């Protein structure tokens, strides 16, 4: 073994890349260490592509092992199960900047596995994983146009931009952004922010790109020392004869088809033309071409036609110019029994979004490497096949749905009230009922509307918009509110969510090199105008949260009790609190600091539960009257229960005005009496009196 190591300083972190010691049979393997977080990243690539394959089979698997944090997994089998949401999102985060750096026509299967083997609880392993994946590919010899690196950026008013902040620093930051890029260009941005300006967001991207050059250079030097010989791979030759034949016969017809505004009709016409091209140009005789090749080149021609029209300044596929948002239709309160609902339609993209309130028992428990966390805000995104007019498998949640749900959640997260202001668990669900471009941003708009419809005190309305780019040479066009086809045929997917004040989420994926600062600035500016337009239309329907939550939402009351009394409220084995919940129908949550939250279907039920709790936790007060029950009679008096678990002594001399010879002549066990507290001694013993209670006081207690 001849291990090769490269160590470099990356902000406040020390990063070490190592290869040649572990996983030596992989095409490329790098062990990345970043402040005691250790990630093993392997890249394995097929030497030959499967004949006839027409897609690039890249798969990225990020996995966290519980032993990395010194823990044994839960569950019956005590081993890691299916990928968590964090693992799925990080897999996508690694995939997105890597995918565009493989050359066109490379169809060999590539699999990247990132395994977190040691975890520093303040360091997110995602940056180390992206750096490791880039380094593993760079030394593997696989055709790859790297190296690339990644950086996390935070922002505070006091310190400005922060490079690779840890979890603790992010808690106090107004920004959590991950940027990946090469020496020359930014390829991917993923972020959430607390209403930062467009200039601040762009500044963060440029700051990250500048700072990551240290890592890019380190990977380059590492590959020079440890890299394998580059593969002798040649891109497939362009079949100029087929391309010219397709242009001559179908370019005009394709252009006309893309003038059809309705997506289904447009797809039907393009399908007819594709079929016609196969019939005319595919076959085994001389001068004909393979059917799959005809389909492939027909798609290339489609892309070229649409892109040229946009660059020339001609109307887009649906007739809009580059800055116009599609027609909007906005409704709230569309579902009668949900706590909040909205139907947001933008052109042929539609999201039906609901907001549901729950108790603190409904919060999501997240078992992460850095420790267990409670998540009181959940956002789930569903993309059924009917939304694009298809009939296909309906099954579990896919990576795409998890990713889109997290992006939409980021858009509204910063505007959600904290638990002190609004102690409810909240779940938003976005059902995509139609899709033709940027359903995730429709989900942001719909969720903002649904949350306000539910009476949840969000700080401001939020809207989202997707931008696109077509770039040919030095000419480019930035597109507002892209269609699905424009996303597929374009060079950039740029999604921005925010309020009137600033940006709350920014996601960017770039498929080409050469995206300039100017292009990003124009995209952010156009997105701002589009966002303000959408917010204006949303505000016409609902501009602030409703005054109260829905009638069928849980009613919540909060009281404080002495923390020492918590055990009394819970009771032996939970018997007392269970009895209160069963009798009143309420749900009760108690924090360690004595905060008690009561959730009930009606205020009457909540008040009854509060009364029961205050009875249990109440302390006797000197001079106060109580209605009590005689529990036990002794020679010198009687013990009377005045509060749950609280008995006091009525001395024989305090039973009546006259002299009492026998207590049993005046009192019986189980008898209800009105008493006054005379004194409470240092040991908590309560002295009671019956004779000090006046007739008027007795009457008031009876009423």
From Swiss-Prot:
InterPro entries registered for this protein in UniProt: ExoRNase_PH_dom1, ExoRNase_PH_dom2, ExoRNase_PH_dom2_sf, KH_dom, KH_dom_type_1, KH_dom_type_1_sf, NA-bd_OB-fold, PNPase
Keywords of the record: Cytoplasm, Magnesium, Metal-binding, Nucleotidyltransferase, RNA-binding, Transferase
Chain sites annotated for binding Mg(2+): 487, 493
Cofactors, names only: Mg(2+)
Subcellular localization(s) per the UniProt record: Cytoplasm
Biological process, per Gene Ontology: mRNA catabolic process; RNA processing
Single GO cellular component term: cytosol
Top-rank lineage group of the source organism: Bacteria
S1 motif domain mapped to chain residues: 623-691
PROSITE patterns per record: KH_TYPE_1, S1
Catalytic reaction equation(s): RNA(n+1) + phosphate = RNA(n) + a ribonucleoside 5'-diphosphate
UniProt cross-references to SMART domains, sorted A to Z: KH, S1
Domain named KH: residues: 554-613
EC numbers: 2.7.7.8
PANTHER family named among the record's database cross-references: POLYRIBONUCLEOTIDE NUCLEOTIDYLTRANSFERASE, POLYRIBONUCLEOTIDE NUCLEOTIDYLTRANSFERASE 1, MITOCHONDRIAL
Assembly: Component of the RNA degradosome, which is a multiprotein complex involved in RNA processing and mRNA degradation.
NCBIfam families cross-referenced by the UniProt entry: polynuc_phos, PRK11824.1
Family: Belongs to the polyribonucleotide nucleotidyltransferase family.
Physiological role: Involved in mRNA degradation. Catalyzes the phosphorolysis of single-stranded polyribonucleotides processively in the 3'- to 5'-direction.
UniProt protein name: Polyribonucleotide nucleotidyltransferase
Species name: Hahella chejuensis (strain KCTC 2396)
Taxonomic placement: Bacteria, Pseudomonadati, Pseudomonadota, Gammaproteobacteria, Oceanospirillales
Designated gene of the protein: pnp
């Amino acid at each position: 073994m001849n291990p090769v190591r490269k160590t470099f300083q990356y902000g406040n972190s020390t990063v070490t890349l190592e290869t040649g010691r572990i996983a030596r049979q992989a095409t490329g393997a790098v062990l990345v260490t970043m402040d005691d977080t250790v990630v093993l990243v392997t890249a394995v690539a097929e030497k030959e592509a499967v004949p006839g394959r027409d897609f690039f089979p890249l798969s990225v698997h990020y996995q966290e092992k519980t032993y990395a944090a010194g823990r044994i997994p839960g569950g019956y089998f005590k081993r890691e199960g299916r990928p968590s949401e964090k693992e799925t999102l990080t897999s996508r985060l690694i995939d997105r900047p890597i995918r565009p750096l493989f050359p066109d026509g490379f169809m060999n299967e590539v699999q990247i596995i990132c395994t977190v083997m040691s975890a520093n609880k303040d360091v997110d392993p995602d940056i180390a994983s992206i750096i490791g994946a880039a380094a593993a590919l760079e030394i593997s010899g696989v055709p790859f146009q790297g190296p690339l690196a990644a950086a996390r950026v935070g922002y505070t008013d006091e310190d400005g931009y922060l490079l690779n902040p840890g979890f603790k620093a992010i808690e106090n930051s107004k920004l959590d952004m991950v940027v990946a890029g090469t020496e020359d260009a930014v390829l991917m941005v993923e972020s959430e922010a607390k209403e930062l300006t467009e200039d601040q967001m762009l500044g963060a991207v440029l700051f990250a790109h500048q700072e990551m050059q240290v890592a890019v250079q380190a990977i380059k030097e590492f590959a020079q020392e440890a890299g394998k010989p580059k593969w002798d791979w040649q891109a497939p030759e362009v079949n100029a004869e087929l391309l010219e034949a397709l242009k001559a016969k179908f370019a005009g017809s394709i252009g006309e088809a893309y003038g059809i505004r309705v997506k289904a009709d447009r797809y039907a016409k393009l399908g007819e033309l594709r079929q016609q091209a196969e019939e005319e140009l595919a076959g085994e005789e001389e001068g004909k071409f393979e059917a799959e090749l005809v389909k492939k080149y027909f798609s290339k021609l489609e892309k070229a036609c649409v892109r040229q029209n946009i660059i020339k300044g001609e109307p887009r596929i649906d007739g809009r110019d580059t800055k116009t948002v599609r027609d909007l239709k906005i409704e709230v309160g569309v579902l009668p029994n949900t706590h909040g609902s909205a139907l947001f339609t933008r052109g042929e993209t539609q999201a039906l979004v609901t907001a549901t309130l729950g108790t603190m028992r409904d919060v999501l428990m997240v078992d992460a490497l850095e420790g267990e966390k409670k998540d009181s805000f959940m956002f789930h995104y569903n993309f059924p096949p009917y939304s694009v007019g298809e009939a296909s498998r309906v099954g579990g949640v896919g990576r795409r749905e998890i990713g889109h749900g997290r992006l939409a959640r980021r858009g509204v997260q910063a505007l959600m009230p904290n638990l002190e202001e609004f102690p409810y668990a909240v779940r938003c669900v976005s059902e995509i009922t139609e899709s033709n471009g940027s359903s995730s941003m429709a989900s942001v708009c719909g969720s903002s509307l649904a949350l306000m419809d539910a009476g949840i005190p969000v700080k401001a309305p939020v809207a989202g918009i997707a931008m696109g780019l077509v770039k040919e040479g030095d000419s480019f066009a930035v597109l507002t509110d892209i269609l699905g086809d424009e996303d597929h045929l374009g060079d950039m997917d740029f999604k921005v969510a925010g309020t009137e004040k600033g940006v709350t989420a920014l996601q960017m994926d770039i498929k080409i090199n050469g995206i300039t600062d100017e292009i990003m600035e124009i995209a952010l500016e156009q997105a701002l105008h589009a966002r303000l337009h959408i917010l204006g239309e949303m505000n016409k329907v609902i501009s602030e949260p409703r005054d109260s939550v829905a009638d069928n939402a849980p009613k919540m009351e909060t009281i404080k009790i002495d923390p020492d009394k918590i055990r009394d409220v819970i009771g032996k084995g939970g018997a007392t609190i269970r009895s209160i919940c069963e009798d009143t129908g309420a749900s009760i949550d108690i924090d360690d600091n004595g905060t008690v939250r009561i959730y009930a279907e009606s205020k009457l039920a909540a008040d009854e539960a509060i009364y029961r709790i205050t009875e249990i936790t109440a302390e006797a007060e000197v001079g106060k009257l109580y209605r009590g029950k005689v529990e036990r009679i002794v020679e010198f008096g009687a013990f009377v229960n005045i509060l749950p678990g609280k008995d006091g002594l009525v001395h024989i001399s305090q039973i009546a005005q006259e002299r009492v010879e026998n207590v049993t002549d005046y009192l019986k066990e189980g008898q209800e009496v009105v008493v006054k507290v005379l004194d409470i001694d240092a040991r908590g013993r309560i002295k009671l009196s019956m004779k000090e209670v006046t007739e008027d006081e007795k009457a008031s207690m009876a009423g």
